[in-house]
């Protein structure tokens, strides 16, 4: 019984690997960003005007946010600190 389970798992993994590779190949050919203009008998590939993500061009024209994200030490920096300490610090109720 162990051999059957092992072979079934191996066959499933192999099927998924082949299906993923075939899907990636068909997807890359359908989303090709190159144009092929033909003049006479010569066809020349030209690059697309916009680069792909991962090349450092995606979102380069977007303005950066003036306010930082939480976790960078900027979240709530403009808020005034409380004059009274928290209870447990020895300041609670003592004047």
Curated annotation (Swiss-Prot):
Q: Give the source species.
A: Haemophilus influenzae (strain ATCC 51907 / DSM 11121 / KW20 / Rd)
Q: Where is the composition biased (Basic and acidic residues)?
A: 55-89
Ranges where the record places region Disordered: 55-95
Q: What is this protein called?
A: Uncharacterized protein HI_1601
What does the UniProt keyword field contain?
Answer: Signal
Q: Where is the signal peptide?
A: 1-24
